[in-house]
Amino acid sequence: MKEKKIAYVGFAFLHHKNTKAGYQRIKEYVKYDYIFDCQKYFDRYFKEEKNPVSIFVAKVMSKIFGVKLFPWYIIKIWWKGLFRRDIVFHFVYSESLFLPFPRYIGRNKAVCTVHQPLEVLEKWNMVKPLCKADSIILVGEAELEKFNSVIGKNNVVYIPHGISTDFYHPLDTVKKKRLLLTVGDWLRDFVFANKVYQKLLDMDPVLQIVVVSREKNRHYLTANPRLKFLCGISDEDLRNLYLESSVLFLPLLRYTANNSLLEAGACGCNIIISSDHPDNSYIPSQYVKLVKMDVDKTVSMIMNNHAMTYNMGLVKYIEDNYSWDVIGKKTESFLRSF
């Protein structure tokens, strides 16, 4: 049987552009035969419109097509698919890329990577379009059975998100501090986190706290000279914070593909996850501590679990299971198997 050609359809979110983060990095590790780069379209799509005419056009487009700008990348895909039937199109952020009219791929195949929990997709009305995909890749394993049940085709598989282990790893030149670090934005509970931070700062006069997130989350935090909020920092600065921290604290509302968890794990961080969903972690329980979203229990867990050395067992586990080299090979093998 002739091997399928595979095509990348993707872009980088603004906060992932020119960084080591983001699932779009998979194109560096999978030998795609075709690249459909949708970056210009999504740069414009996510830009806030202020022109009244543009706002009106966006509303009309949303009514007709379900998106505020016509997705011109579809024309390129359709044209390529019109003359071939041996291509597997890989939509790397299917929540944004895979639209309710997938027949534009012709007699080729569509594989959609999904990053969000099922309940989020249901709110976004994305479940029905995804039912038309030939296969779905989940980057989290917890909802695999649920997705297969809802989609109803037994065509949902789990291949995790990757991480740049050649960049994120321990360095002898960086020393640990009594530092609590929180990184990330999506599905983080900063209201809960702030309660934890304030109690910790009252109890521990030496502790420093650094939160790395998007600017919109700054207002959740109560000002304190030992609580620093950062956004838009370099990969090198972020890596150094992982390496300096004595604990990485993630207040997770729900599971999602988690760059910060993998980055921290690759750096050998001491990781504490507070969540009411015990399946939040990519990482076995011997490498990460899980606690309910209870302020007192979380504070106690953090106070008793500062670590001043790297967790080298976790570093090895991440490298063996989540390096982009490993994930790229798994993904390419799956895509070419159709």
Over which residues does each language-model region extend?
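Conserved acidic donor-binding segment of nucleotide-sugar-dependent glycosyltransferases
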Residues: S285-D296, M301-A307
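Conserved donor-binding/catalytic core segment of Leloir-type glycosyltransferases
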Residues: D172-Q198
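Acidic donor-binding loop of glycosyltransferase active sites
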Residues: L243-T256, C269-N270
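Short His-centered aromatic/hydrophobic patch
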Residues: F91-L97
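Nucleotide-activated donor-binding/catalytic signature segment of Leloir-type glycosyltransferases, i.e.
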Residues: E215-R239
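A charged, aromatic-enriched C-terminal amphipathic alpha-helix characteristic of glycosyltransferases
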Residues: M293, H306-S337
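Acidic anion/phosphate-binding donor-loop and adjacent secondary structure
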Residues: E145, V157-K177, F338
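A short, active-site helix/loop in glycosyltransferases that binds the activated sugar's phosphate group
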Residues: A133-N155, R218, T331
